[in-house]
């Protein structure tokens, strides 16, 4: 029997205008109708009955508390512990939104699987249900885009919400923020914290799947579009949002989709 699936993401009102609207429209156009879409948001956007809109602050009060607690803490907003420069690697507040959304969705899921999908992803080709479900083998808790000697690319992660590891994994993730213990880590962003949690729970028997296996996954390589996901989606990381698509130099594998032929 096929497993039920919900895709989860979040964006602000400003993010809706910049990339969120395109995310939703291409999702509705190309994803299977029996895969649900849940969006944690500031404001509900009218005209999209296919979407379950969740008011972020109401659903995640601990996020509101965390942000208020660190409102004036520059180290929680990207300034390195040594104070020398600012970087996303230490922007705990920015990436807390994603962490709280993932954990809330996973702990309150009504479907077998949830998929975190960054809102700056564009779907360019029809996505087969069977392809999506096949990404996470039975008895594996999560599937993600691994990279060598560096934190994973977490723009796409599949979680089995029925797994025995789901509750403890997500509660541990929330606890990093609720207790401020994330500031004891080398980096503070969601991908690094996810990486540490995967290593911790894998040591206790949790099984995972690396979707980048057999594909380029070195630091600096656009691992998302060079994985099997690239056949159906583009991830507009960083400055690619302004361009509206990835660059030809990002591609390491021949792609058959018309979308990539137009680069």
Predicted features along the sequence, with ranges:
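N-proximal low-complexity "stem/linker" segments adjacent to membrane-targeting elements
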Residues: 1-21
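Short, polar loop motifs at secondary-structure junctions
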Residues: 39-46
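Active-site-proximal specificity loops/subdomain of glycosyltransferases
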Residues: 46-108
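Conserved catalytic core of nucleotide-sugar-dependent glycosyltransferases
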Residues: 124-188
């Amino acid at each position: 029997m096929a497993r039920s699936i919900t895709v989860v993401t979040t964006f602000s009102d400003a993010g809706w205008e910049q990339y969120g609207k395109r995310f939703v429209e291409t999702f509705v156009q190309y994803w299977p109708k029996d895969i649900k879409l849940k969006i944690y948001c500031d404001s509900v956007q009218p005209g999209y009955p296919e979407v379950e809109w969740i008011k972020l602050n109401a659903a995640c009060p601990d996020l509101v508390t965390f942000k208020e607690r660190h409102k004036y803490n520059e180290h929680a907003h990207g300034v390195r512990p040594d104070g020398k420069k600012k970087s996303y690697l230490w922007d705990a507040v920015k990436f807390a939104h994603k962490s709280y959304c993932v954990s809330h969705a996973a702990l309150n899921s009504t479907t077998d699987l949830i998929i975190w999908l960054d809102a700056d992803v564009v779907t360019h080709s029809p996505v087969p249900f069977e392809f999506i479900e096949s990404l996470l083998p039975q008895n594996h808790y999560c599937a993600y885009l691994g990279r060598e000697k560096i934190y994973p690319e977490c723009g796409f992660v599949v979680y089995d919400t029925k797994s025995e590891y789901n509750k403890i994994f997500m509660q541990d993730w929330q606890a990093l923020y609720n207790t401020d213990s994330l500031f004891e880590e080398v980096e503070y962003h969601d991908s690094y914290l996810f990486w540490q949690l995967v290593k911790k729970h894998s040591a206790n028997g949790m099984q995972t799947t690396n979707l980048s296996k057999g594909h380029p996954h070195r630091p600096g390589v656009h691992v998302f579009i060079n994985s099997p996901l690239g056949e159906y989606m583009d991830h507009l990381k960083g400055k690619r949002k302004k361009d509206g698509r990835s660059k030809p130099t990002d591609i390491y594998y021949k792609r058959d989709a018309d979308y990539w032929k137009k680069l």
